[in-house]
């Protein structure tokens, strides 16, 4: 019998401030992204975490993207 997929899924977190920041504010080009897992049963809404953004060189809000 095949194993079920389970309730944990892999999600990508993207910096919310990198898209609106100008080139002068950024240390390097691009958008900061992290991958993590979340429990589908406990967290139905999109995940939001404060993570370090290497492009802006500070802690920023990272949101789950599709």
Curated annotation (Swiss-Prot):
Record-level GO cellular component terms: cytoplasm; ribonucleoprotein complex; ribosome
Pfam families: Ribosomal_L33
GO terms under biological process: translation
Domain of life of the organism encoding this protein: Bacteria
Alphabetical list of SUPFAM superfamilies matching this protein: Zn-binding ribosomal proteins
Molecular function (Gene Ontology), one example: structural constituent of ribosome
UniProt keywords, alphabetically: Ribonucleoprotein, Ribosomal protein
NCBIfam families: PRK00504.1, PRK00595.1, rpmG_bact
UniProt record similarity statement: Belongs to the bacterial ribosomal protein bL33 family.
Name of this protein: Large ribosomal subunit protein bL33B
Organism: Synechococcus sp. (strain CC9605)
């Amino acid at each position: 019998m095949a194993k079920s997929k389970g309730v944990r899924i892999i999600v990508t977190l993207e910096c919310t401030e990198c898209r609106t920041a100008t080139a002068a504010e950024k240390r390097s080009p691009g958008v900061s992204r992290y991958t993590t897992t979340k429990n589908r049963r406990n967290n139905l809404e999109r995940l939001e975490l404060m993570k370090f953004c290497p492009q802006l060189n500070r802690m920023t809000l990272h949101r789950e993207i599709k």
